[in-house]
């Protein structure tokens, strides 16, 4: 069998690119994927077209990677002061700034071409908003304590795009899902920001974790409650059944677990709570898919 052995420096460079794009850390991709699938399945009232499933699965992967590249570009001068990020390839000098920008542009271009070639005009128009949100979010932490709100919009923009691709229109359900996901993103990314709060305070990075202060867990709980309420509204308006509501109950139960994990506000507990949100999103998707299938 033919084997190709890459030179050591090439292998090291590819590994740095993979770390820059978070190929080794799929949690962000999964958190973006589940709400996209919610929209695809609900807009199709069952299984979406195979083409849209492939396009949006790949699009989620590419745009999340693009977002990581531009985020590290924006934060390159701050990341060296934060324990969790000081060894990132761009901060450590193993990847240059222009390379991160080029990767962002290239991945956005590939995603845009998929939309142009395989979806409809409405989805194409919406894609410009998605690209803009992906670009501006990383810079918001310089100017506002609500960068998580911009991240929520960026992470939720695939919902109207997926809906438009499948149904060629948008509905009230689209925006209910969008709102639920924005609130959910703010909740789980606040948990993530609590991991870095002490370092962020030192270097002047703004976040909801800093804004909320000692009320952080209470506000996260409020956001989580609002997510569950809105998803119940989605179920009622879409006339969904027991499987869907079981998925929402599972999400609510996991939200309680997240509060337990973050009870002492330490790095490990908050990070575990953040990671566990993957299962909350999956639970809703599984319930929705089963409900529409049966």
From Swiss-Prot:
<keyword id="KW-0472">Membrane</keyword>
<keyword id="KW-0997">Cell inner membrane</keyword>
<keyword id="KW-0812">Transmembrane</keyword>
<feature type="transmembrane region" description="Helical">
    <location>
        <begin position="274"/>
        <end position="294"/>
    </location>
</feature>
<dbReference type="GO" id="GO:0006744">
    <property type="term" value="P:ubiquinone biosynthetic process"/>
</dbReference>
<dbReference type="GO" id="GO:0005886">
    <property type="term" value="C:plasma membrane"/>
</dbReference>
<feature type="transmembrane region" description="Helical">
    <location>
        <begin position="175"/>
        <end position="195"/>
    </location>
</feature>
<keyword id="KW-0460">Magnesium</keyword>
<dbReference type="InterPro" id="IPR039653">
    <property type="entry name" value="Prenyltransferase"/>
</dbReference>
<dbReference type="GO" id="GO:0008412">
    <property type="term" value="F:4-hydroxybenzoate polyprenyltransferase activity"/>
</dbReference>
<comment type="pathway">
    <text>Cofactor biosynthesis; ubiquinone biosynthesis.</text>
</comment>
<dbReference type="InterPro" id="IPR044878">
    <property type="entry name" value="UbiA_sf"/>
</dbReference>
<keyword id="KW-0808">Transferase</keyword>
<keyword id="KW-1133">Transmembrane helix</keyword>
<dbReference type="InterPro" id="IPR006370">
    <property type="entry name" value="HB_polyprenyltransferase-like"/>
</dbReference>
<dbReference type="Pfam" id="PF01040">
    <property type="entry name" value="UbiA"/>
</dbReference>
<keyword id="KW-1003">Cell membrane</keyword>
<feature type="transmembrane region" description="Helical">
    <location>
        <begin position="242"/>
        <end position="262"/>
    </location>
</feature>
<comment type="function">
    <text>Catalyzes the prenylation of para-hydroxybenzoate (PHB) with an all-trans polyprenyl group. Mediates the second step in the final reaction sequence of ubiquinone-8 (UQ-8) biosynthesis, which is the condensation of the polyisoprenoid side chain with PHB, generating the first membrane-bound Q intermediate 3-octaprenyl-4-hydroxybenzoate.</text>
</comment>
<feature type="transmembrane region" description="Helical">
    <location>
        <begin position="120"/>
        <end position="140"/>
    </location>
</feature>
<feature type="transmembrane region" description="Helical">
    <location>
        <begin position="98"/>
        <end position="118"/>
    </location>
</feature>
<feature type="transmembrane region" description="Helical">
    <location>
        <begin position="218"/>
        <end position="238"/>
    </location>
</feature>
<dbReference type="InterPro" id="IPR000537">
    <property type="entry name" value="UbiA_prenyltransferase"/>
</dbReference>
<feature type="transmembrane region" description="Helical">
    <location>
        <begin position="20"/>
        <end position="42"/>
    </location>
</feature>
<comment type="similarity">
    <text>Belongs to the UbiA prenyltransferase family.</text>
</comment>
<feature type="transmembrane region" description="Helical">
    <location>
        <begin position="145"/>
        <end position="165"/>
    </location>
</feature>
<keyword id="KW-0831">Ubiquinone biosynthesis</keyword>
<protein>
    <recommendedName>
        <fullName>4-hydroxybenzoate octaprenyltransferase</fullName>
        <ecNumber>2.5.1.39</ecNumber>
    </recommendedName>
</protein>
């Amino acid at each position: 069998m033919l084997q190709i052995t890459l030179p050591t420096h090439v292998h090291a460079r590819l590994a740095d690119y993979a770390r820059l794009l978070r190929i080794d850390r799929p949690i962000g991709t999964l958190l973006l994927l589940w709400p996209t699938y919610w929209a695809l399945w609900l807009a199709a009232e069952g299984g979406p077209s195979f083409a849209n499933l492939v396009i949006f699965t790949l699009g989620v992967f590419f745009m999340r990677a693009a977002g990581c590249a531009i985020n590290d570009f924006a934060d390159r001068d701050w990341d060296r002061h934060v324990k969790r990020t000081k060894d990132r390839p761009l901060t450590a000098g193993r990847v240059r700034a222009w390379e991160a920008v080029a990767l962002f542009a290239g991945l956005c271009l590939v995603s845009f071409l998929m939309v142009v070639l395989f979806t409809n005009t409405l989805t194409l128009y919406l894609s410009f908003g998605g690209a803009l949100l992906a670009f501006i979010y990383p810079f918001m932490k310089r100017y506002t304590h609500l960068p998580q709100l911009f991240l929520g919009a960026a992470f939720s923009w695939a919902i109207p795009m997926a809906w438009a691709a499948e149904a060629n229109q948008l509905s009230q359900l689209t925006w209910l899902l969008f709102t639920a996901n924005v609130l959910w993103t703010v909740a789980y990314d606040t948990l993530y920001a609590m991991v870095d709060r002490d370092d962020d305070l030192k270097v002047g990075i703004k976040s909801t974790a800093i804004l909320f202060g000692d009320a952080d867990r209470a506000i996260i709980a409020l956001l989580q409650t609002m997510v569950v309420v809105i998803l119940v509204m989605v179920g009622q308006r879409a006339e969904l059944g027991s499987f869907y509501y079981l998925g929402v109950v599972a999400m609510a139960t996991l939200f309680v677990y997240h509060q337990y994990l973050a009870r002492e506000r330490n790095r490990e507990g908050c990070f575990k709570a953040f990671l566990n949100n993957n299962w909350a999103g999956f639970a809703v998707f599984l319930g929705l898919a089963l409900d529409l299938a049966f």
